[in-house]
From Swiss-Prot:
CDD domains: URO-D. It holds the Pfam family URO-D. This is Uroporphyrinogen decarboxylase. Pathway: Porphyrin-containing compound metabolism; protoporphyrin-IX biosynthesis; coproporphyrinogen-III from 5-aminolevulinate: step 4/4. One of its GO terms (biological process) is protoporphyrinogen IX biosynthetic process. Keywords: Cytoplasm, Decarboxylase, Lyase, Porphyrin biosynthesis. The keyword Lyase applies. The gene is hemE. Disulfide bonds: none annotated. Signal peptide: none annotated. The lineage of its organism: Bacteria, Bacillati, Bacillota, Bacilli, Bacillales. GO terms for molecular function: uroporphyrinogen decarboxylase activity. It comes from Bacillus thuringiensis (strain Al Hakam). The record marks 76 as: Transition state stabilizer. Transmembrane segments: none annotated. One of its GO terms (cellular component) is cytosol.
């Protein structure tokens, strides 16, 4: 069954005019929700993501609670890595841990290929369930970017400085480019499968790429990103790029064949546009503001919206994920304010 959905988010992604500014929030499904915390008392991340009914419920929760204009699939960026031979364990209080980190070209050559229908059928089943039976807003599929995935694979887990990753990039360029190619192939196949299953847009998260300078990005990372976006673009859905602490790279992203440039709070929207970013923009509230009094939040959000609405193609989001400490009522109130304020301003 084909469901009728609210396409405001998709219109904004395409740079079209909308009646109001669409909004969704990174990590909108997660630790800030009491319902989610109850589920996590009984089930692990692995168990939730491997159970399509449970995962679909978690994914849809913020749509029902906050009235956001898009859902994003609840899963981890590490989800596809076991399929290519990477042993990943999500450890509480630490994050992803990999016991067999990449150290050589031989390690890279041992990596396999992903076959989503065989390797991650539960993810595709979750997407099908959501898009055929549950959602009246678009579902966003996603993947980690090659650099961020490689950083976990080389460091063996989270890092503060990514010294091992960048040292590998500089000292072993042949192995590095082989790894980028392997990961680009995986991301392309993975995203296409999500789209075929029903995702109406996709976002690529490059969480740690801000540690790389512009010159190195152009040489060591951008070619893989160009290939990913060019190949996935043939699927005909909007594509979003997001990184953290990477304001110096927004023009590099703008050059890629994508639709939406994601911004964090470090770069004002009007400054990004002054630098030549003329594609659709998503962002860019500092999630720390969500812990402030409502009067402070409202004034801050007005400023962001006033910048974003100056040209068509704007999606409100946070610059990073929702904190566990955020009151769900604040997010609900925020969405209502974004919709009402922007509708009034755009009608003038």
């Amino acid at each position: 069954m084909v469901r009728t959905i609210n396409e405001t988010f998709l219109k904004a992604c395409r740079g079209e005019r909308t009646d109001y500014v669409p909004a969704w929030y990174m990590r909108q499904a997660g630790r800030s929700q009491p319902e989610y915390r109850k589920i996590k008392e009984k089930y692990s991340l692995f168990e939730i993501t491997h159970n399509p009914e449970l995962c679909a419920y978690v994914t849809k929760l913020p749509v029902d609670q906050y009235n956001v204009d898009a859902a994003i699939l609840y899963k981890d960026i590490m989800s596809p890595l076991p399929a290519i031979g990477v042993d990943v364990e999500i450890k509480s209080g630490i994050g992803p841990v990999i016991d067999n980190p990449i150290r050589s070209l031989q390690d890279v050559e041992k990596l396999g290929e992903i076959n989503p229908e065989d390797d991650v059928p539960y993810i595709l089943d979750t997407i099908r369930l959501l898009t055929t039976e549950m959602l009246d807003v678009p579902l966003i599929g996603f993947s980690g970017a090659p650099f961020t995935l490689a950083s976990y694979m080389i460091e063996g887990g989270p890092s503060r400085n990514y010294h091992n990753t960048k040292a590998f990039m500089y000292a072993e360029p042949k192995a590095w480019f082989a790894l980028m190619d392997k990961l680009a192939d995986m991301v392309i196949t993975y995203l296409k499968a999500q789209i075929n299953a029903g995702a109406k847009a996709v976002q690529i998260f490059d969480s740690w790429v801000g540690t790389v300078n512009v010159a190195d990005y152009r040489v060591f990372i951008k070619p893989a990103m160009e290939r990913i976006f060019a190949e996935v673009r043939t699927m005909g859905v909007p594509m979003i790029m997001h990184g953290v602490g990477a304001a110096h790279l927004v023009n590099e992203w703008h050059d890629l064949p994508l639709d939406v440039v994601g911004l964090d709070w470090r770069l004002p929207i009007e400054e990004a546009r002054a630098r030549g970013v003329h594609k659709a923009v998503q962002g860019n509230m500092d999630p720390s503001f969500l812990l402030a009094p409502w009067s402070v939040i409202e004034e801050h959000v007005k400023g962001i919206l006033d910048q974003g609405m100056k040209q068509p193609g704007y999606i409100f989001n946070l610059g990073h994920g929702v904190f566990p400490e955020v009151n769900p009522d604040t997010l609900k109130r925020l969405t209502t304010f974004i919709h009402e304020y922007s509708k009034g301003q755009l009608a003038k």
